[in-house]
Amino acid sequence: MASQLTDAFARKFYYLRLSITDVCNFRCTYCLPDGYKPGGVTNNGFLTVDEIRRVTRAFASLGTEKVRLTGGEPSLRRDFTDIIAAVGENDAIRQIAVTTNGYRLARDAANWREAGLTGVNVSVDSLDARQFHAITGQDKFRQVMAGIDAAFDAGFEKVKVNTVLMRDVNHYQLDTFLAWIQPRPIQLRFIELMETGEGSDLFRKHHISGQVLRDELIKRGWIHQLRQRSDGPAQVFCHPDYAGEIGLIMPYEKDFCATCNRLRVSSVGKLHLCLFGDGGVSLRDLLQDDAQQYALEERISDALREKKQTHFLHQSNTGITQNLSYIGG
């Protein structure tokens, strides 16, 4: 087994975000406002179960303990349950999570849990059904809420909910969100709107700093918790009267990248060192045979030497990320 993946800035990487498709059936305003438009990749062009098995085996050998399956919408893959099971074949991987729009959660949460899934993140940008429809292009609010309930019923002890923070859209709804998580063990994560290549106008119109919410939380008696390794870049707040927690993810905050612990592999097998980095390193030619594992590990380790200390979002440099479905956010 190789040593733990570590970059030139002594950051250790134990978390892999693995995109398995860039197809999505929602049309979120900040991601795919015009809906999914196939590029050069057909469904047959995405990583196969065997390729996923090989890439996660290599990362597990390099110290990866957590894999998050992303998209697009991962559950649109008909073999999604098989993918969960394939990742779970690696004993070193202790956590297998998914980020989903919740579209199929009510139907499939129990099956995913049985296959080995340990964590669920659901995207919910508004608790108002009409506004949810306006943001996502889908009238599925009640279906997604039922999915969150189904996740708890299936045995997931905590569900994370991702909410993209947008000025004049949902930034003023903090009290509504807090009331929702008071009786529920949900970690509600407000994510600052990030600029992407296709979303510059939206960013200028709707970006608001997460510091605004942080100040409001502190006023209301919420306590900033000591950072746990599993938090990654999130600042987590708790309150003695609430079963839920609040997380703030603020990529424009000073030193945001200092706690980076994750690498990304796209749905076509490219290693990306940063969500907003350039290029990417193709791994796919080394995912065709089990005998290639050593060479695959070497390529991953060598690529990490090029990881930059920080992103360049402050200079409006969004790198290769034209939209957030591209490499899974």
Curated annotation (Swiss-Prot):
Which pathway does the record list?
A: Cofactor biosynthesis; molybdopterin biosynthesis
Secreted among the record's keywords? Answer: no
Q: Which Pfam families match?
A: Mob_synth_C, Radical_SAM
Q: Which cofactor does it need?
A: [4Fe-4S] cluster
Single GO MF descriptor = GTP binding
**Enzyme class, spelled out:** lyase
Read off the CDD domains from this record: Radical_SAM, Twitch_MoaA
Q: Where does [4Fe-4S] cluster 1 bind?
A: 24, 28, 31
Question: So where does S-adenosyl-L-methionine get bound?
Answer: 30, 72, 123, 194
Q: What are the alphabetically sorted keywords of the record? A: 4Fe-4S, GTP-binding, Iron, Iron-sulfur, Lyase, Metal-binding, Molybdenum cofactor biosynthesis, Nucleotide-binding, S-adenosyl-L-methionine
Binding of GTP, residues: 17, 68, 99, 160, 262-264
Q: Which family does it belong to?
A: Belongs to the radical SAM superfamily. MoaA family.
Q: How does it assemble?
A: Monomer and homodimer.
In Swiss-Prot or TrEMBL terms, this protein is called: GTP 3',8-cyclase
